[in-house]
Each structure stands twice: as structure tokens, then as C-alpha cells.
Regions:
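Sequence/fold signature of self-assembling virion shell proteins
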Residues: 49-90, 97-102, 108-210
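Charge-rich, acidic-biased intrinsically disordered regions
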Residues: 35-57
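Long, contiguous amphipathic alpha-helices that act as assembly "spine/axial" helices in icosahedral shell
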Residues: 1-41, 103, 188-190
Length: 210
């Protein structure tokens, strides 16, 4: 430090520490999506069942925010997902006219999603039909790739139901440094507190793929 031998390294390592903190937050953010899938079932919503379930209990019965039969992303599965979203009900069993807003996918599905969401005609068929998903504006905000999703064939649709997925930032990121009396080294640390969860599972629809 005295001869500026490690000045550049110190700057590089503090940036690496910030990058590590950011990466950790992204990994934690997608855990509910990955762990809440039907066969994984390691993340439950407040009603006691997995985040993505065909039988979320209500006062009047149940509602679902996943396909009855899991399927890979294609025209049929996307259309059925949007139909199921539109059939969501509230606690009393009344239709709430929910709509899909944005699709979240892993990087492995970005080319499939581009064809499904941008083609004017139907994909994978010789029929001269329009792409109903595009022409009806069924997913107005399109799709976004999340590179931290580890299930390569799962896809998710955010709905227009408020208070769905939640993040609480309990303590903002802070950094500190101090010198070590014995060695003369300089130590750096970073700390923040946050949590991720769900208030209303109607806010997201998830499909596991096959």
C-alpha cells in the first residue's frame, strides 16, 4: 500500500466485491421461481401450497397459476397459459379478468420466444394463419431474458394482478474497509439485507416444461 504496489488491485477487488453482491441478489431473486415449480415444491406461497400450483385454496374453492399438464414453451402452451390466466378467480370464486403482461424466460428459450412473440404468422406450421398472440396484443410487454434462471425449459408470465411477487430491501448495501494491525493489510467488506417472496400467487403464472 505504501508504495502504491496494490492500489490498482484494491480498486479491482472492490469492484469484484460489488459484482459478487449483485450476483448473489440476482440468484436469491429467482429462487422462488425455481423452487416454487410443481415438482420441485420447495417454496410455498402463503396458502400452504407450492408457488405454482393447480389448486391454490380459496374460500370458494381453488384457482391455478400453472398448467394442468406441464409443457414446453410453444404456441399451444403459451395460449393455454393465457387462457388459464384469464380464468383466475378471487377468494369468492369471481372472475377477475386477469391478463398476462410480460413473459420471463431463461436464455435457452430466447429464440423460441422471439419467434412466438414477433412473427406475424403462426410458427411451426405451413398454414397461412395470423399469429393470434401478436395480433391480439396478449402479452403487451413482450418477454425478458433472465440469465439467472437455471431451469432451461420453464417459463413464467407476470400478470396485471397487483401485489404479486415482492422484494423487501431491509438494509441497503454498505461497504467498509479497515487496516489489520498485525499484518498491515487492508480488509474490505460489504453488507446488505433483503428478502424475496410472494403476496398474491395470481401475480405470476409459471410452467415447468417437460
Amino acid at each position: 500500500i505504501e508504495d502504491n504496489l496494490y492500489d490498482r488491485l484494491a480498486s479491482r477487488y472492490t469492484k469484484a466485491l460489488a459484482r459478487s453482491m449483485s450476483n448473489a441478489k440476482q440468484v436469491k431473486a429467482v429462487e422462488p421461481l425455481i423452487q416454487g415449480l410443481p415438482t420441485t415444491d420447495n417454496f410455498d406461497s402463503g396458502d400452504g401450497v407450492s408457488l405454482f400450483n393447480t389448486s391454490h385454496p380459496t374460500v370458494a374453492g381453488t384457482f391455478q397459476n400453472t398448467l394442468t399438464t406441464q409443457a414446453d414453451l410453444n404456441e399451444t402452451s403459451l395460449e393455454q397459459s393465457l387462457i388459464d390466466i384469464g380464468q383466475m378467480t378471487d377468494e369468492r370464486g369471481l372472475r377477475i379478468a386477469a391478463r398476462g403482461v410480460k413473459m420471463i424466460i431463461p436464455s435457452e428459450l430466447q429464440f423460441t420466444a422471439e419467434r412466438l412473440m414477433k412473427s406475424q404468422g403462426r410458427t411451426g406450421t405451413a398454414d397461412n394463419d395470423i399469429n393470434a398472440i401478436v395480433s391480439m396484443g396478449m402479452v403487451p410487454q413482450g418477454y425478458r431474458v433472465n440469465n439467472y434462471l437455471t431451469d432451461t425449459d420453464a417459463f413464467y408470465i407476470l400478470t396485471d394482478i397487483p401485489n404479486g411477487m415482492k422484494m423487501f430491501n431491509r438494509a441497503p448495501l454498505t461497504t467498509a474497509m479497515e487496516g489489520d494491525f498485525d499484518t498491515g493489510n487492508v480488509r474490505y467488506k460489504a453488507r446488505e439485507r433483503y428478502s424475496f417472496g410472494v403476496s398474491d400467487p395470481r401475480g405470476i403464472f409459471g410452467v415447468e416444461g417437460t
